[in-house]
Amino acid sequence: MNNNNTGSHAPETSPSRRTFVKSMSAAGLGLGLAGIARPSRAQAPAAKPGRAKILKFGSLGTDIHPATISARAFADIVNKGTGGAIDVQVFPSAQLGGEREVAEGMLIGSVQGMSLTLAVLGNWVPEAQLFELPFLFRDEQHALAVMSSPIADEMAEKFTPKGFRVLGYPIGGIRHPMAKFPINVPADVKGKKMRTIQSPLHITLWQTLGAIPTPLPPGEIYGGMQTGVIDFFDNAKSSYWDMKWYEVAPYLTELSHIYTFSAFTIAERFWQGLTPEQQKVVRDAAGQTSLRHTQLVLEDDSVALKKSVEKGTKVIVADRKPWQDAMTPIWTQFGAKVGGMPAIQKVVAYRG
């Protein structure tokens, strides 16, 4: 991926992401996960008074969530690598607001960074919703290969004119339905209130299945399930455990219908205020910690499901065919917004 000042040149490949896909592929997506260190809160070197550039970096996750862990690792690398000239301050648990609020904050200068889902960034670059299409990816290996390819690098270039500098694509999670009731087939969600993210694609997707989309931030899911504001939602297994959603949504249907990738994003206005040397430190740190984020998510998903089952979660392994038949027609509906059917087929056919 090209991350120079102008953003006008052809994208270059991120070596760290390509290496990760190759190594994960070689070991069935499992190589090296157990040895990933979980960093403590970053301690930045002291900067000269009045000289430090403040980089407020948001995270929706708690302190133990992969997004926050990797954000603190990013802070540590940047703070030390710039000798304190950049002071990265991490704000977990949505302290800076939801994704939409943080993205808007980047544009006005109140926030400088966050790993934002492509679904939310699709409000500014509709083509980014390409990677959110249901059943677009065959499996984890296919998804990771595509997101470390020129296809994803070219997408990153589209964000720069909109005010966002995309420096990596950590996986945010693999979505599965989580509910108060058993979900086996698409008809099971008809008439049910479904918590969605603030994405036109996600809202439309569940509307086509007869559900009633109800956009809510992650922090309101637990209460929404308790009070009946929503009946079900979809999310990653790691978040299901971390947020204790198993207490209010005892049924988890393994579906893997959407692979949610985030864009490691720095506000373009902040990026342009950095020296070339500082940009390199930030760019390299983003690459390293996007890799860390992905590794932790894949590791945590496996562990989280086991822990949730011990707490009473009932896991349903659904037949994917009826869901594919019900969901993939949205490809045609959103095709024009994501670059046309050729763009979709390019991803489907990608082999790495």
What would you call each of these model-derived segments?
Residues 145:
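Short beta-strand-centered segments that line the small-molecule binding cleft or hinge
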Residues 2, 13-142, 150-352:
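N-terminal secretory/targeting leader peptides
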Residues 1-7:
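N-terminal acidic, proline/glycine-rich, low-complexity intrinsically disordered segments
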